[in-house]
């Protein structure tokens, strides 16, 4: 649920605001009710007692919002279900309004408002607490500074220009708020200077809990609908004061009564929509006016006489703002279509149909224009509702299953029969009673005659395609150059003293929209990426905290590539004649063959130019990132991520970087170059007559599969810039490439049909991941294109984040697949064409098949594979989606990727190269073992736990343990949530695991403990399984949510020599580790490494509270400090030095530790002296008082001079004893930071070669 508090000051008194708000609600309700599909019905309007806010007025309304929703929402809902109910309680100066949709049970919009005569300075008027207060976003709306743009701007409503004739108020200056507050503060309003000031405090809670749509719709309502409507409405409240000034509350009530009667007559079809206000060229609803004291319109409407309308007592008003921004470009005829007025009769010059007949036709049908066909079965209205409710119920159940508390209930699917019946009947092509409209685009069918069609009469003509796009109300973006999202200005380079770039992974999101996006706006792209970034951070904070601040996500916006394809296919639809396109009801999308859209899109003459723009935009984003503070000195890995259409552009760009062109044989990876020809210099499929015009060349290309998927020769006006030799290439190297619901394999399959011998172009990246939902109508598998053997193998199922947040450990490597399925890769035993073997017979033969997989088979598969892992990954989606119409799914799936924790957790596991926290870096090349929970998450033992832990991140911690062999080996940990330990995990199960053979051993389960009331557990390893010498990783996992804490236990022999470092005293050159990243003292890391190389055990101590453990360890890891054992204070301590002393004394006296040297600040001298250390063993950096200088060795020349002395002869000696044999040499590991990309690629190749060598030796 998103919570946002709006504070809207206005130069009115509280009582004037009340009159203005109620007047405009009534006025706009009357003006903007057009009948079916757009209007308001007032059901109840009566006083109440002892309700919200005390006594007031209760109103219940029904808003018909069908004409105001964007297409991606309307595609999910039937027309007959597009209503919103409002309940409003108006107990002025408190109001509350709640909006619900009977069809969407998990949707709600709740708005509370308080009105105070101030300037908005009160911080918490709603008395919020806990997570509500933490998650609240405050947004101050200034009616003067916050301007409207484009068609929303009306000069007469601009407070900078408006002057009231009745009151003489206005105009308002930029600093009006400060001026008015100085005038009215502490005075009675209005003042003698006729100045007043009040503020509406509105808190809005939006919830839309359905799979794949929650975040996008909640942000859509907040960012687009609510704020935009409130700004415009309050500007109107000020600019329309000449109409409402002087009215009393009795006048308002009479207006409401008359409006209720008028609306009942209009919405019931009892009068024609001939009122002047109805024909205004804008579409807006009074629902918005109710919550914003006004509503949207394109230009000023004539004042309504004070015969009033209804009272929408709630100052909050309507939530049908959900789609009102789509109406900006609507024309009068589009409004008429949306309200059921038949335009086909007007076009043909015939008489207008009756209103009742128009409403009846508007209620028919389900899929766009096809809905106008007559259906002989029952009532379409009731049945659409039944089907739609069935669908959304299935989505709701799946949404609930993702919550913290899981329920396992049965679903009653008895309605399947009715659904099957509905599907078959709806697809029958009945004739239409109405005469065909004249003047339609039927003549476009003559395009098949290439030489006879005139240019302006072709559906392939650019003028026609642009006209189709403009009639939808969308701006055509194909010709416009891609704009780059520069979220920050160029900043100067970082400080030269910065040791390393904070960003280790850069993710570039190539966003071109879904397959049905004719022209997506930049704001929508930014919203998707913002949602993705927020979801990414939430998952990292919960389970991958070491990656926080090290991953940067940038957007590469791309023009839409489907505009022409959608225009052509919708024109070819059998139902293209039925209605004209409009923004309110995009036609024929349900009738378009979705699978053909990407094929026509890549065949567009503009496709290669769009790829050039995409590459240029990606390069600009990359270079801007390098200039920014977060990217200065960046040398990490770059990950590219493409959505449905963006993946096609990204693939072409990556193939260019490889020196190949996907559309040519020369671009084939590992294929013979002698057969390659340049498509621009000579192409056997090019038209014989080079002088053919563009339309003829397009049709010629349409006759051949190869030319269908490779863009025709560029038009003459830009042929020089589109040659392969001048094609733009990426300026950086991509590590991993993720595709979301991509149709790439279909495009490549069609290319393969033309030349079966040519290999498919391989993108220039290390690994490709093809993520898709099985029910997605455009997504398809990629692996069978590279090897037919994989058509038998199922794609990898991405584990559910709700059950396996750290992954389930399933094998992903290509060689692991060959090993686990040898029967499919054996040349001698062709099981592809044979009978299916039983499990018993297959088990008996597999042992012989594993050794018989030939080295040539493995080598051939690796050569043509796009990485070292599997390529196809199937995502979970609710079963109810299979019952949605195909045209509704692309929008839904496209929105789901940006907020899916399954997708994000999978990406993190791949780019981080680990699925748990790895052991310390070692000098060998062995891979670190990954941790995978052995079982899915369980329900919490205490019911309140899931409620308490919502919206808070885990902050578990455990100090490292040093114990002498033979003594008790006890592990202690504390499990808390929130940055300041606000929530304690009480009475819940925690699993304790340990790795006995580090660094690449197996995790061993030790025990399950239950936390006490303080969130602590204490576990002692039994003597019979106690551990010998060594340093062992320990992981404690919370059973309920799989959050975990990591620590190390060191079992050491007596007289183990160590070196102690105080983190704050000896490492940091600034005061705080918790604020900005502090600088490291020069040479500190080198001194630590010197002692480690001599075999000493390193111990890091700090008096900081253990709640800061994750942040401090991450800081040490970022700066590559060698591994050591860390000790924090237990909670907030008033004596941090005493904690250090007690800790070191315990090690020396009880565990036989010998401290050779100790480093710190002047404050640490007393600590080391109390432990019994000599002056020549204590090294102090920084300023030291004269009284203490004799108690320690002061490093006045810094670490550099000290290190030189240590490295000199006699300066230091190697550690003695057996302890140095068990102490590893390495650093704290941070994913993506410990090894550079080139070395990682070398190790991967080395591993693959080793595996192949093993197979060869076995054979």
Swiss-Prot record:
Biased amino acid composition, Acidic residues: 318-335
Catalytic activity as recorded in UniProt: a 1,2-diacyl-sn-glycero-3-phospho-(1D-myo-inositol)(in) = a 1,2-diacyl-sn-glycero-3-phospho-(1D-myo-inositol)(out); a 1,2-diacyl-sn-glycero-3-phosphate(in) = a 1,2-diacyl-sn-glycero-3-phosphate(out)
Composition bias, Polar residues: 679-689
Transmembrane portions of the chain: none
UniProt domain DDHD: residue ranges: 730-913
Disulphide bridges, residue numbers: none
Disruption phenotype annotation: Flies exhibit rapid light-induced retinal degeneration.
PROSITE patterns from the UniProt entry: DDHD (PS51043)
GO CC field: cytoplasm; membrane; plasma membrane; subrhabdomeral cisterna
Tissue spec. comment: Expressed in adult heads, not detected in bodies.
Function field: Catalyzes the transfer of phosphatidylinositol (PI) and phosphatidic acid (PA) between membranes. May control phosphatidylinositol concentration in transport vesicles from the subrhabdomeric cisternae (SRC) to the rhabdomere. May function as a calcium transporter.
Recorded family membership: Belongs to the PtdIns transfer protein family. PI transfer class IIA subfamily.
Annotated protein name in UniProt: Protein retinal degeneration B
Record organism: Drosophila melanogaster (Fruit fly)
